Amino acid sequence: MSQEDLEIDLDAIQRRMDGAMHALRTEFGSLRTGRASASILEPIHVDAYGQQTPLNQLGTINVPEPRMVVINVWDKGMISKVERAIRDSGIGINPVVDGPIIRLPIPELNEERRKELTKVAAHYAEQARVAIRNVRRDGMDQIKKAKAAGMAEDDQKMWSDEVQALTDKAIAAVDKALEEKQKEIMQV
């Protein structure tokens, strides 16, 4: 195995760690923080036209005020299905139908709910850390295989240090993202 092969693998390791970070940001985006955001609707799918369709493909989602999300559903026959999907989603928001528009007033979070959300955010962050550590383990396994195939001890140490540096950087990014999200959640 040549060093070029390992460099390609380092790029793959970096991409997989970035993927874990992207997944974490997506999870964080779905947490309701008391502020209006279109991202809280991303996980919602509506039974439309015989299949589960993402809500953002059925209408325009706007945030006109800090505590209000407005959905302008394109097909007026879908309004009741969109409303039902939002109610059944468990995000804790009651939609208000106003003609062709659905308004979602975002209620203020109480202290207990804020603490629950910080725990959920910490759980998501831990899942991302585990995913990153699994990528690190896979990278270290590749290095061990390369050593068995004749890689020099110094090269093995260098590549191991690089994989560890990528891991440390990714874990630090997760910790920073978690700290920011918890601060956002606890902000009144």
UniProtKB/Swiss-Prot annotation:
Keywords of this entry: Cytoplasm, Protein biosynthesis
Location of the protein in the cell: Cytoplasm
Broad class of the protein's primary localization: cytoplasm
GO cellular component: cytosol
Residues spanning the membrane: none
GO molecular function: ribosomal large subunit binding
Biological process annotations from GO: cytoplasmic translational termination
Keyword Protein biosynthesis attached: yes
CDD domains in alphabetical order: RRF
Keyword Glycoprotein: no
HAMAP family, A to Z: RRF
UniProt record similarity statement: Belongs to the RRF family.
Function: Responsible for the release of ribosomes from messenger RNA at the termination of protein biosynthesis. May increase the efficiency of translation by recycling ribosomes from one round of translation to another.
Classification via NCBIfam families: frr
Name this protein carries in UniProt: Ribosome-recycling factor
Annotated source species: Cereibacter sphaeroides (strain ATCC 17025 / ATH 2.4.3) (Rhodobacter sphaeroides)
